[in-house]
């Protein structure tokens, strides 16, 4: 287990560990416990470790070769900010079929890696990523299937604060791995700036 990237209470305050009342066999290894009300709770240390692993993996790519997507409303602003901070390409909102597979489509792009906010709501992007043979990094909750996911980050992928914090951490760690930020340097904007304003 790696050292925590931020204090435990900050992870807890953002609700990263709050899962759902369903679980899949794929996600079982990331579950810490089940509450008396049947809600599955994710292991924050495993989330932390997967953010580190995903950031290291993404840092092997040029920002322009990374595509981050979110159909889910609460993920759209975090994805936008992730792109602004790292230089990655983003598609917040509806993913148009053919974006990765149809060269005749006006907005056709050829990324080398996909970052998805939710394997279920971003399934079209993930299907196309698999069709063209690029790896998929995804934020995954307790009920997600990982069949088409190469690197899963176990997290509450429905929570506004949780999604924002994970994308903030990914951006920070990515820039640290690239040597753009020093090992102990933070982004010049707080995680709250990644949140969808309501």
Swiss-Prot record:
Disulfide bonds: none annotated. One of its GO terms (cellular component) is small ribosomal subunit. InterPro entries: Ribosomal_uS2, Ribosomal_uS2_arc, Ribosomal_uS2_CS, Ribosomal_uS2_euk/arc, Ribosomal_uS2_flav_dom_sf. PROSITE patterns: RIBOSOMAL_S2_1. GO terms for molecular function: structural constituent of ribosome. Keywords: Ribonucleoprotein, Ribosomal protein. GO terms for biological process: translation. Belongs to the universal ribosomal protein uS2 family. This is Small ribosomal subunit protein uS2. The gene is rps2.
């Amino acid at each position: 287990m790696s050292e925590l990237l931020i204090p435990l209470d900050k992870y807890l305050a953002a609700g990263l560990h709050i899962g759902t009342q369903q679980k899949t066999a794929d996600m079982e290894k990331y579950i810490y416990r089940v509450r008396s009300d049947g809600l599955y709770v994710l292991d924050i240390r495993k989330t932390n470790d997967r953010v580190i692993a995903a950031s290291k993996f993404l840092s092997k790519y040029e920002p322009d070769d990374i595509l981050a997507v979110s159909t889910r409303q609460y993920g759209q602003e975090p994805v936008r900010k992730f792109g602004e901070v790292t230089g990655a390409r983003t598609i917040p909102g509806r993913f148009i079929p053919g974006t990765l597979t149809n060269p005749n489509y006006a907005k056709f792009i050829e990324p080398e890696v996909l970052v998805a906010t939710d394997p279920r709501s971003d399934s079209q992007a993930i299907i196309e990523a698999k069709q063209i043979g690029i790896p998929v990094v995804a934020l995954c909750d307790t009920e997600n299937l990982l069949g088409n996911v190469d690197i899963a980050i176990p997290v509450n992928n429905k929570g506004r604060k949780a999604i924002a914090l994970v994308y903030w951490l990914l951006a920070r760690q990515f820039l640290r791995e690239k040597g753009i930020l020093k090992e102990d340097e933070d982004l010049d904007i707080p995680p709250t700036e990644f949140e969808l304003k309501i």
